[in-house]
Amino acid sequence: MARYRQPERLTRTISCSDDYVDLKPVNEQPSDKMDPNLGLIASMPKVDQEDRSDLQRRWRNLTKLKPGLSEVNELDNESTPAVLIFGGINTARPTDYLNSASMFLYHLDRNNWNFYGTMLEPRNYHAAAYFHGKVYLFGGYNPLHCIKGKMQATSTTFQLTLDVKQWRRRADMPSARAHHGVTIMDERIFVFGGKDSNGNIIASVEMYEPELDQWTSLASIPEPLMGSAVTNNEGLIYVVGGLTTKKEKNQEGVLSNKIYCFDPLNNKWYRKPPLPCPRAFASATTQNKKIWIWGGASLSEGGTLASTTSVDIWDPKKGRFEQHLIFDSPKHCLAVTKAGTQVFIIGGMSSKENSSLAEVQVYDRKRDILQKCAFLPVSLTGTAAVGIPVNRSPASDITTSKTTRSGSRKTQKTLKDKQQSDIHARNKAARTIQLNYRKYHASKQRRSGIPRDALRKKINVGEGDRVSGRIRTYITGYRPKAPGDDDLSKDFAPVTIPFWPPDPDTSDSVFHTVVDQFHCAKEKMQFKHFYTIPRQIDPNLGMLLFMDEDYQHSKKVLGLRNVESTPYYMSRFHATGDIQDTSIPVIIAIGGVDPQDPMNVSYGRSVFQYHPLKDRWEFFGFMSLPRNHHAAAYYRGAIYVTGGCDPHIRCWGEMVATKMTFVYRLSSNKWTRVADMHSARSHHSMVVFNDSIYVIGGRDDSGRLSASVESYVPALDEWNQEKPMPLPRMGMAVVSHGGYLWVMGGVTSTKGGNINPPVLDDVICYDPVFKHWVSGKPLRIARAFGSAVVCDDKIWLCGGAAPSQDENNYLVSIPAIDVYDNEALEWIQKATLSCPRHSSVVVALESCLYLIGGINSHELSAINRNELYTTDSDTVQSIRELPVQLTGMAAVTIPPTCVTFRSESLSIMIRHKVVT
């Protein structure tokens, strides 16, 4: 589990990264020229304890703030998001303490503000954060507590549980502060800088863990800052601009144009390219992995604060600024929050109006425009705002606590995977484990008295003895194993087979066994020879080999028949009658095989349905025949399944590819066999392009790799030959993008006795219109049996297997998610899966990528763990597991019968469901 490094508690000296020298806070306040209130609040009266108690008592029983403003007690956000603001101060009436204690609720569909009640204490220039159904308020000024006419910063933390509308005080911050910045990342809340109760600008950084109600001090900002804009982007936190102090004493505060970047995982600070001009008291948000800086204040010619109308966008990758929007009126100290597809800009100060503002503007991210909406009930500056998402689950505190702990464990695991993202180190560890296992297996054979060389010698076989079809290993003593008490759902337990999985035969385990193993589909062969696949390029890692004779012999001895029965896991499923949902897209997973139970053909016929918003797998039914390592595609109300291996058909201990094509039409709810392909194939790819379905490459029924490409026209029910690939390959990833069929990676055959692993890193593109192949940008690393999908007009390549560097060149699963940058024309690693996998399936649902099943070479088994990667937030989350460990599946996305939700709304709902 990744942990944040907890530094020593800092007092006076501010530590920073090696790029900066240590600074010390200066015990002087900025002059009035740098006052964010523009000097409008010169002095505040002192309120004694009795008056404070009386005010707070009256506020608790308050039902109406002013005439014409209704009070609500419910969020009423079942259909649209809501915006909730807390406190603030009116510069024209700063002693109206009720304004600083009030909460206002805005409904997007009604375009009006309502009074939502009062807080425990009045606050202004504080910070707020929404987290798992609760709102947290941090610090700020309390206008009821003043010393020498100045409001005092506080260190209190308040929690509002929205379900029951209940306030609770939580652990205080180590430092009192106001004008500070807050952001949420990785289930934690980070607080940066501010101004303390002594009037000093501070640089301290503190982290709050809501689950533990605990504060931790982190590495301080390289210089003291207040009024900075804070946001996070791709695992880093950015602190933009602000008001700081000079290192020399008796100097006024100055505006900063610096951008600091904080890495919470390593507890380090870095400097980024500065702002074009100094700016403070702005707000920042992250949209499309770019940082938006809203408003703020710069220096006028007279040296005072001047509000700005600019909304700038900063690209962290390119370090480039551009002005994107302009406000109607300049403003600073504004509150900015995101709610759904909109960004709300609320209140603030204006140097032009010389007063606080009641103006509220909304930025529509889809239409890229600024609009005005209902004004605040009162002009406010220094307020805090949060966006409340749609359909927030009304769970109890206990359920929320459990969900938070579960989400925390997932996030900590994701952090650990990001910290250990070195693929080569993982491959080295996997090779060490596998090498030790093989040594142990060889020593076990020596102890058993069977020399390794005896496997290649001719031996005498008795009448009742059997010989394995490929390795010629003398095997005896097969008998059924009695079922245990904990596994009564199966009639028969797996057969115990000594020395399984076996080591590859040295005479057949080199790559020259697949030299030129491809042919044209029209080629006439006088005899048919089956080429077994070397274990070094076998996606199943040898776990499915050499089972044919054992299975048939056990079946004959036991007198078994082919009986179609309901799988044992059916009792754990919710029944589903329709394969298509009315309002939400669903994922359909078809077939597959469990390497640890390869004789269970019910897995290959099973059809599962996954509902994204329910995060639940349901058993839909069976397809006509069992299949694994096949391909599927959805086209105009029908699911097409091509090729794949049939567990009933084996040759030399391996399942054989088929050429059959099945279609499931949603209108008739029936499986139908249509025209067969010209070539049998498995481990191939299938994609839809311009009213045709294309199948590419794979391994044919003779065990040879294929370079053929075929296209199927559903309207004519016929297959046509296309121009073959330059090289035969299987296990490649294929997508349709930009008018081309992109073929990425895969495994090819070797020539001339070359022992290098035949895993490819090249990318070739096929033009179906002009019938020619062109070369693309090679992959970042060579990989095979990966999965690719197009999402947000980009190609995403997930998982796969890379060749190892030992003498046997075994395949090793990798956890990388790569994306093709259309501008830079290169492949970039974007994320790391928590579980390395290959031979898995990936489907795209709006901005969400679902990775299902596959094989993990580190565990030497198939996996049932599934993961969700969101492209817009760049996060990896675990989702509901499959009922069994499966690999070689195929999956498609079925659209709803009626489109109800917008794509972005659906993505937000999915992320909210997974996190909560």
Swiss-Prot record:
UniProt-listed Gene3D superfamilies: Kelch-type beta propeller (2.120.10.80)
Keyword presence, Repeat: yes
Tissues in which the protein is found: Sperm.
Domain of life where this protein originates: Eukaryota
Keywords, sorted A to Z: Kelch repeat, Repeat
UniProt key word Cell cycle: no
Region (Disordered): 393-426
Biased composition (Basic and acidic residues): 414-425
Kelch repeat coordinates: 82-133, 134-187, 188-235, 237-289, 291-341, 342-390, 586-637, 638-691, 692-739, 741-793, 795-847, 849-896
Function: May have an enzymatic role. Found the acrosomal vesicle at the anterior of sperm but not in the acrosomal process.
Name of this chain's protein: Beta-scruin
Lineage start: Eukaryota, Metazoa, Ecdysozoa, Arthropoda, Chelicerata
